[in-house]
């Protein structure tokens, strides 16, 4: 089926209104100059955090549904849309029980797609890993949310607070339940396995917005626990994040390589919880937007290379570079993982580094993270480009990949201008 469509004036108006509303709302990180920085309606809350995460889902959802219309079956597209709808609701829900429902329901469609659509032999092992973490934490999560709702006398997150004879350990347990979905150490083992055994479109959505659901849950319900009493866990996460970057150097599977990089990158917004105030906390989730776009871009690139060269081995991937266009896309994709200017991650990391000035531990972490985080993608980029024997080819079947990647490159590097 052809991937080229004629869009009428209706589509043009819809896209124009969405872009106009995004410009109207964002006006910088965490700022809404017409209606204030938050919009409450009891059941729903729409703030800068919701805005950036919803934008992430809409970008990934729209471009994947349009560009891969001929590659994805109707069943796959349906389950992806279901997951996106529940994720958007989760980002904007203020009610604890409904939040739990849409939080869990946003992941189940992707779990089903791993079972049903993955062509890899170990997909059942990966599915059991994912479902194990998903189901084992589901019951404790709803029980804790119900208990805190009862103690605080309200189901709405914005009316919760520390007190009311609630032990701080309850909030710590709730935080770790959410950490399993991010995932942070020691709950990280499922992510490389699931990425390696799932289809590329599922990997795009997993790294795109599923990893951010846990951070959102922590922000909504346990935002007040991140103080000096919790900094020991942050210290462990930072050390392990550097270890993930080193581990990525030994990976030959492209998807596992990127999964370990994502495990390292996701520590940055968690660090932002400790060094940011209420005004600047939006930078952590603005970083999530940049990370989601960058991860989706590189997973899409690996998908394209897999179709061209029939391998995910990083040593052999250079055979998939078929000309100047693919070479340019490779360069921009790898640089997005390095937080290269003018990516969203670059500006967020600059701000977070400035917030960490004067704190020796944070500065040491940033030195190691920025060095290895920039070096690892550049090594792969150099390997793919140096002494590469490629031939120029033009094949209509690959245009959908190139358009998808070009659109994501635009958002990775120029979203800071639009948003």
Task: Name every feature range the model reports, one short phrase each.
Residues 1-419:
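Core, highly hydrophobic multi-pass alpha-helical transmembrane subunits of bioenergetic inner membranes
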């Amino acid at each position: 089926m052809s991937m080229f469509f004629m869009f009428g004036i209706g589509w043009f108006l819809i896209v124009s209104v969405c872009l106009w509303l995004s410009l109207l709302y964002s006006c910088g990180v965490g700022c809404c100059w017409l209606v204030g920085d938050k919009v409450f309606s009891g059941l729903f809350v729409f703030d800068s955090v919701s805005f950036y995460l919803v934008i992430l889902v809409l970008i990934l959802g729209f471009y994947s549904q349009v560009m891969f219309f001929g590659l994805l079956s109707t069943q796959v597209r349906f389950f992806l849309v279901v997951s996106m709808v529940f994720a958007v609701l989760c980002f904007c829900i203020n009610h604890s029980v409904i939040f739990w429902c849409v939080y869990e329901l946003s992941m189940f469609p992707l779990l089903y797609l791993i079972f049903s659509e993955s062509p890899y032999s170990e997909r059942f092992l990966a599915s059991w890993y994912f479902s194990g973490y998903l189901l084992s934490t589901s019951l404790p999560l709803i029980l804790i949310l119900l208990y805190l709702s009862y103690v605080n006398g309200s189901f709405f997150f914005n009316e919760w607070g520390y007190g009311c004879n609630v032990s701080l350990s309850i909030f710590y347990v709730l935080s770790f339940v959410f950490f399993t979905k991010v995932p942070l150490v020691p709950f990280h083992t499922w992510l490389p396995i699931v990425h390696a055994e799932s289809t590329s479109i599922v990997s795009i959505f997993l790294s795109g917005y599923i990893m951010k659901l846990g951070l959102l849950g922590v922000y909504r319900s346990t935002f007040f626990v991140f103080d000096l009493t919790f900094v020991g866990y942050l210290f462990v996460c930072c050390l392990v994040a550097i270890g993930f970057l080193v581990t990525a150097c030994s990976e030959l599977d492209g998807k596992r390589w990127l999964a370990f990089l994502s495990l390292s990158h996701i520590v940055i917004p968690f660090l932002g919880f400790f060094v940011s105030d209420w005004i600047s906390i939006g930078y952590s989730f603005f970083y999530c937007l940049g990370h989601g776009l960058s991860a989706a871009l590189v997973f899409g690139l690996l998908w394209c290379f897999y179709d061209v060269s029939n391998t995910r081995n990083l040593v052999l991937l250079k055979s998939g570079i078929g000309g100047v266009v693919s070479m340019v896309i490779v360069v921009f994709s790898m640089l997005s993982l390095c937080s290269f200017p003018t990516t969203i991650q670059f500006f967020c990391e600059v701000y977070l580094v400035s917030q960490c000035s004067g704190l020796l531990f944070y500065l040491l972490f940033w030195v190691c993270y920025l060095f290895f985080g920039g070096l690892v993608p550049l090594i792969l980029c150099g390997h793919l480009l140096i002494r590469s024997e490629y031939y120029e080819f033009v094949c209509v079947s690959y245009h959908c990949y190139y358009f998808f990647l070009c659109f994501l490159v635009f958002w990775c590097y120029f979203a800071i201008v639009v948003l």
